[in-house]
């Protein structure tokens, strides 16, 4: 994957609905000074914006973010070591209790789920650390 292009994910096979190994890359030279992302509820607008902003940060591209709903505040949360104790402050104690789990167990599950998901998409620790330091 070329470092000069934004990595937005991987192509999805239309027949199986599963990700392929083919990356979706975007040339930041095609960006203008403003962007608008529109779409139906649940169509991936926030996910696309997060990906674009993270990739911009990794390449030192500045951004001003207007986020009236607060969807993008989690951009500042980076846990490159994927340690359960890093996730624990963000676990809802009441939800954990209702699920019959301790906070520690819920944090361990969250850490494990994030680790598996990132690995599945080919995102390693070095990339997470670079984003944290961007």
What are these regions (language model features)?
Residues 1-43, 47-131:
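Basic- and hydrophobic-enriched, low-structure N-terminal and domain-boundary segments
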């Amino acid at each position: 994957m070329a470092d000069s292009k934004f990595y937005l994910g991987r192509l999805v096979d239309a027949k199986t609905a599963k990700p392929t190994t083919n990356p979706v890359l975007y040339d930041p030279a095609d960006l203008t000074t403003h962007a608008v992302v529109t779409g139906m509820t649940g169509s991936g607008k926030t996910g696309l914006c997060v990906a674009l902003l993270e990739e911009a940060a990794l390449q030192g591209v500045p951004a001003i973010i207007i986020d009236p709903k607060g969807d993008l505040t989690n951009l500042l949360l980076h846990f490159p070591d994927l340690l359960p104790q890093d996730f624990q402050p963000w676990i809802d104690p009441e939800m954990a209790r209702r699920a019959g789990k301790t906070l520690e167990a819920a944090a361990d599950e969250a850490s494990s789920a994030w680790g598996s998901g990132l690995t599945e998409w080919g995102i390693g620790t070095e990339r997470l650390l670079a984003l944290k330091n961007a």
